[in-house]
């Protein structure tokens, strides 16, 4: 059985790690390099960095910090933020990132997924999907530009159809960001993740809602995702990664100790 991945997520803005609630009200929580090194030493399986304002500001993320991270940690890491072309992705990967993730740029130009797949291989290409549950219609809807509350907007896609499309275009992995759960620590959206798992034949990573170690056990056992991404519970030392992995193992969830 493949080990489940524990993935701290670091939202980056102006060279600092920040965190909000439901994609709003971001506050600075620390230095990128300091936090990356700490998570690597604590036993994280990989890291994800989102430069949250890059797509909104129509620019590529700052590749200088990518190079610094690559020199100082020895676990895989994925980078996202304003990657709109093969050339953009190459700049990030050349600086040492293991994977690149695209979100809003893929919605604007879906063929970008195939271009990245063809150039770098499936294993490098992650697609992030920001999914909002509309309580009125009961539908899961894809949003874009969520790094800025003033720019965030609904797209033409429903989540299920976009999941199918990005797979067809060559995505190697999907990170499903459940917007209603983001930062509130009430548990992952297992119902939504289970529905997406049925459609998804590539690795699926859960994001949004982790509040306790039991939440990780539940999401792995009940929705069968491949990894779980979390931010605030790690940034604020609510959960220790080493203790979490031992807890998973004790609850019959495979984890790298």
UniProtKB/Swiss-Prot annotation:
Q: What is this protein called?
A: Imidazole glycerol phosphate synthase subunit HisF
The UniProt keyword set, sorted, is: Amino-acid biosynthesis, Cytoplasm, Histidine biosynthesis, Lyase
GO MF terms listed in the record are: imidazoleglycerol-phosphate synthase activity; lyase activity
Q: How does it assemble?
A: Heterodimer of HisH and HisF.
Q: Give the originating organism.
A: Pseudoalteromonas translucida (strain TAC 125)
Task: Determine if Amino-acid biosynthesis is one of this entry's keywords.
Answer: yes
Q: Per the record, what are the reactions this protein catalyses?
A: 5-[(5-phospho-1-deoxy-D-ribulos-1-ylimino)methylamino]-1-(5-phospho-beta-D-ribosyl)imidazole-4-carboxamide + L-glutamine = D-erythro-1-(imidazol-4-yl)glycerol 3-phosphate + 5-amino-1-(5-phospho-beta-D-ribosyl)imidazole-4-carboxamide + L-glutamate + H(+)
Q: What is its main location?
A: cytoplasm
* GO cellular component entries: cytoplasm
The active site lies at 11, 130
- InterPro entries, A to Z: Aldolase_TIM, His_biosynth, HisF, IGPS_HisA/HisF, RibuloseP-bd_barrel
One GO biological process term is:
L-histidine biosynthetic process
What range does the record give for the signal peptide?
Answer: none
Family (UniProt):
Belongs to the HisA/HisF family.
NCBIfam families linked to this entry: hisF
Q: List the pathway annotation.
A: Amino-acid biosynthesis; L-histidine biosynthesis; L-histidine from 5-phospho-alpha-D-ribose 1-diphosphate: step 5/9
What EC number is given for this enzyme? 4.3.2.10
């Amino acid at each position: 059985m493949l080990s489940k991945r524990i993935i701290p997520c670091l939202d980056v803005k102006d060279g600092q790690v920040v965190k909000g609630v439901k994609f709003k009200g971001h506050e600075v929580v620390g230095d990128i390099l300091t936090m990356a090194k700490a998570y690597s030493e604590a036993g994280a399986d990989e890291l994800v960095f989102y430069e949250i304002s890059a797509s909104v500001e129509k620019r590529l993320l700052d590749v200088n910090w990518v190079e610094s991270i690559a020199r100082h940690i020895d676990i895989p890491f994925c980078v996202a933020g304003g990657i709109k072309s093969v050339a953009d992705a190459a700049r990030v990967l050349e600086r040492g990132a293991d994977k690149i993730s695209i979100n809003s740029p893929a919605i604007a130009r879906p063929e970008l997924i195939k271009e990245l797949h063809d150039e770098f291989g499936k294993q490098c290409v992650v697609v992030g999907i920001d999914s909002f549950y509309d309580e009125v219609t009961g539908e899961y809807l894809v949003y874009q530009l969520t790094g800025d509350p003033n720019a965030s907007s609904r797209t033409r896609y429903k989540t299920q159809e976009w999941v199918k499309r990005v797979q067809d275009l060559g995505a190697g992995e999907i990170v499903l960001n459940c917007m209603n759960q983001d930062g509130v620590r009430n548990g992952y959206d297992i119902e939504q993740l289970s529905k997406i798992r049925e459609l998804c034949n590539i690795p699926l990573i859960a994001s949004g809602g982790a509040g306790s170690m039991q939440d990780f056990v539940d999401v792995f056992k009940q929705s069968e995702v491949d990894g779980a991404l979390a931010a605030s519970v790690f940034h604020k030392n609510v959960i220790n990664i080493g203790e979490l992995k031992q807890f998973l193992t004790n609850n019959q969830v495979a984890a790298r100790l």
